[in-house]
Amino acid sequence: YATGRSNGVDDLELISGQEAQRLEPALGCDLAMYSPSTGIIDAHALMHALLADAQAHGAVIAVESRFKSAQHLGGRWHCEVLGETITSEILINSAGLDAIAVARRIVGLRPELIPEMFFAKGNYARLMGRCPFTRLIYPVPVPGGLGTHLTIDLGGQASFGPDVEWVPSPTPEQAGKGLEGHFSYQVDESRLTRFEADVRTWWPGLPDRALAPGYAGVRPKLVGPNQPAADYLVQGPKEHGLEGLVNLMGMESPGLTSCLAIAQAVREIV
């Protein structure tokens, strides 16, 4: 609550369990934090809008263009991509799961400034049938994640998740080839039993066998199991001494939600 208020979310309220149940009768809780301005976005539509905006300002998006190396020479970055050299004054490493592998290919970036990366798969379970809630419901966070919370997409489909499933980190050789296709995004049906138990801590009336496997994602994390949570790492010239370089590492959820604020922070650096 205090963190949210200090970050500018000025409509947060702490309410009793009875007040929460007046808003959401199916909810079981003793105390709640009410955030009336919380909502959802269409992730794909947002990305398409950002792409269109970037292209309208002259950006060129080059997909399937593997980055080999970068070196700062003569006041410009020289990036080798698909056997060709691209030069620029600014280089932003925003490669998500591959951000550490990209950082290791930047000449002059000291190894001790490149953190170890951990990976946590987040599985979601899909609700079959009607959802009694009209708001997003978040339980108290758990180590490694936000807890099994309720999300409702723009089509009205309710899902629960993500859980935290730590997956083995790729070897340096695997990371060097890129992580596309490295992880499995299948949701194991055996995890549904745990989902049901977690959801029933705040929705006691969840019907039996009402959940089905949903979707999954993999989060790049700067800390591993049983370690305190870490914030995003935004690393600029003040940290590494390389002009025009910004590294964005550990950009896990809610990175998409905060993408415009992250972009503003990067803009202030460069």
Language-model segment annotations:
Residues 26, 208-249, 253, 257:
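FAD-binding beta-loop-beta segment adjacent to the flavin cofactor pocket
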Residues 22-30, 71-78, 86, 223-229, ...:
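A short, glycine/Asx- and small/polar-enriched loop/turn
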Residues 1-23, 29, 147-148:
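Dinucleotide-binding Rossmann-like beta1-alpha1 core, especially the glycine-rich loop
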Residues 110-119, 128-227:
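Active-site lid/adjacent beta-loop-alpha segment flanking the redox-cofactor pocket in flavoenzymes
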Residues 12-15, 60-62, 212:
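General small-molecule cofactor/ligand-binding pocket signal
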Residues 34-90, 101, 260:
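Helical element adjacent to the flavin cofactor pocket in flavoenzyme catalytic cores
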